[in-house]
């Protein structure tokens, strides 16, 4: 998948100074390229037989919704504070460049549902780790993590449950 790196734009000092942002929008605007990237993930995730894919706000929603649609399974959204209606469960966590909070609707899934967590990028693992803990706190059975891009030098995998499936397609 390294040949797809040419479609990923790098933006220095965004969203904060010292961060090199990986912009996947050029991939999303090219249907054939996006399909080439998504097809292996679709196949891998289907072997795990999840009940739901949980996408992390906001860039995780894009591909998570496409995967859920293709796999004919439900989509669960994990959002930033005050974006979901009704009762929510939340958790605070540290980012590569600060602190944040994630929330999930309290009764969005059946107890012990198999959940595959998806985000566009794995950096430090803080966001994905917090989202995984949130799924467990909400009664879900987290079965793995999937990402389009991984920044390997930040060792984000070390902050994820090592007993679970972790898949990334493009590594930097």
Swiss-Prot record:
CDD domains (alphabetical): PRTases_typeI (cd06223)
Example GO molecular function: adenine phosphoribosyltransferase activity
GO process terms (BP): adenine salvage; AMP salvage; purine ribonucleoside salvage
Pfam family, one: Pribosyltran
Physiological role: Catalyzes a salvage reaction resulting in the formation of AMP, that is energically less costly than de novo synthesis.
SUPFAM superfamilies named among the record's database cross-references: PRTase-like (SSF53271)
Protein name: Adenine phosphoribosyltransferase
Family: Belongs to the purine/pyrimidine phosphoribosyltransferase family.
Cross-referenced InterPro entries: Ade_phspho_trans, PRibTrfase_dom, PRTase-like, UPRTase/APRTase
Pathway: Purine metabolism; AMP biosynthesis via salvage pathway; AMP from adenine: step 1/1
Catalytic reaction list: AMP + diphosphate = 5-phospho-alpha-D-ribose 1-diphosphate + adenine
Subunit structure: Homodimer.
Superkingdom of this protein's organism: Bacteria
Alphabetic keyword roster: Cytoplasm, Glycosyltransferase, Purine salvage, Transferase
EC numbers: 2.4.2.7
Regions that span the bilayer: none
């Amino acid at each position: 998948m390294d040949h797809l790196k040419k479609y990923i734009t790098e933006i220095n000092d965004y969203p904060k100074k010292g961060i090199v942002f990986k912009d996947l929008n050029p991939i999303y605007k090219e249907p054939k390229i996006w399909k080439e990237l998504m097809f292996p993930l679709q196949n891998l995730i289907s072997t795990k037989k999840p009940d739901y894919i949980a996408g992390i706000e906001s860039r995780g929603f894009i591909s998570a919704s496409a995967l859920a649609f293709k796999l004919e399974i439900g989509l669960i959204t994990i959002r930033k504070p005050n974006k979901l209606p009704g009762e929510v469960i939340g958790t605070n966590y540290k980012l590569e460049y600060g602190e944040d909070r994630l929330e999930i609707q309290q009764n969005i899934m059946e107890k012990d549902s198999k959940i595959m967590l998806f985000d566009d990028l794995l950096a430090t693992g803080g966001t994905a780790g917090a989202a995984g803990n949130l799924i467990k706190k909400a009664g879900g059975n987290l079965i793995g993590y999937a990402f389009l891009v991984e920044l390997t030098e930040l060792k984000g995998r070390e902050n994820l449950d090592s007993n679970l499936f972790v898949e990334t397609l493009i590594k930097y």
